[in-house]
Amino acid sequence: MLTTTFRLLRAADACEGSYKLFRRAMRAKGYREDQPIPLYEALDSNGLADALWALRAVPSEQREERDRVARLLSCDYAERVLHRFEAVYPKDSRPRRCIETARRFADGQAAREELLAAYRAAAGAAGDAAGAPRAAAWAAGAAGDTVWAAGT
């Protein structure tokens, strides 16, 4: 389970308003200064944007898991718009394969070289779709961005 602390959030330069909201909610639940707080608490008290931001404020021993979670979230978000590309290019599977490769990479089942090849293929799909409806090109680009995020 990913956690953070008040100290880590401050060290990561948390937005003052969001930090105060989170701190007030967590103090009411009994959390103290350096006590680990599950990140799902940030989701409950502050919403998705702040919970995603709080991923940067996890202890160093949790960074590998944090990176995996961030990569898988990127895949989930890219899949949510993939239908826009596939509606215009139903036979072009490059963006879908890109997302699948990013998932496998996050789970340790794909090499970085595979990830780079998938990124290049999705970027090619986005380029090929440049003259198509904007939503299709954007969706293919999102798949490429997913792989980029998975590799960083």
Language model feature labels by segment:
Residues 1-152:
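Short, glycine-biased loop/turn motifs at secondary-structure junctions and
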